[in-house]
Amino acid sequence: MSKKYLSQRISLPLTLLFGFLLIGSVVAAEADPWLRPDFAPAPPENQLTPERVHLGMLLFFDPRLSKKMSMSCASCHNPSLGWSDGLPTAVGFDMHTLARATPTIVNTSFSPIQMWDGRKSTLEDQATGPIEAAGEMNLPLPELIERLKSIPGYASKFEAAYPGMGITAVTVARGLASFERTVLSTESPFDRWRKGDQKAVSASAKHGFELFQDKAKCAVCHMGYNFTDNGFHNIGLKTEGEPDVGRYAQRPLKSMHGAFKTPTLRDIGLTAPYMRNGSYKTLMEVVEHYDRGGDDKTNLDLNMVPLSLTASEKTDLVAFLESLTGVPADVRLPALPH
């Protein structure tokens, strides 16, 4: 993808960002299931350190991780666009259009399974997939490792992050995963309201949250502080051409045919267009899709039924959804090693 899609101002300085992960109102998060924890869980073999997060940030923004050195992870996961790309479906190597929308990486640290079809279980498993995918960054991992080893400035960064382990596919994946664990949603008006600020959201948004939990049935799948059950559902999207089987490719069960992972709703105001195929430009269109009970009834999830929402109820739901978006973090492009 062209660099024009990547904003030059992108979250918190690294030291503040890392500190933010480790301190905060964990007690409040435990007391209110709709408030996310202020820390990112990490596996024992890849606990977060400032050095690992810094290495991962460098790799994430480095276009040298792609075949033609023309795109980085941030080309598709742009911080100023909610860590997505603002396109209906992703654009990869040589401007090749992919079949699915770029998912946000916000709060992926809280997800036990990754990607639209769940084919990767951890951030470490997922991290290098786009790099070597022919349609995405198209750089074989052995070639990537040799390229990184040829850049003198990376040697000390890898050593500081993973002493004695060298520059390998494992340390590249762990570094990227470490940075991605710091990509967390910022405080939204909804969060401030849940913490006691009654003026943080409108009466319309408050009513929308009530609808979200009952009549509209949204919380059946979009539950908890990350607004996802991390499950897979067929929501009846219209498709053109060959149907995308979704989770069925990984788990060939009838219920999984056409099913895709429930995305987070955090920062949803920044991640249009919506759905796994980018088919809706606005949140109102999304609400109307669910109000219809979906369009393609083939293998439809049992929870997808017509809702009979009124016009004002739809407006209230949109107001609530918009309240889930915080201020974009002020990430700055790092100086890359030479």
Question: Predicted regions span which residues?
Answer:
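Periplasmic c-type cytochrome electron-transfer domains
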Residues: 5, 11, 27-338
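Bacterial N-terminal signal peptides
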Residues: 13-25
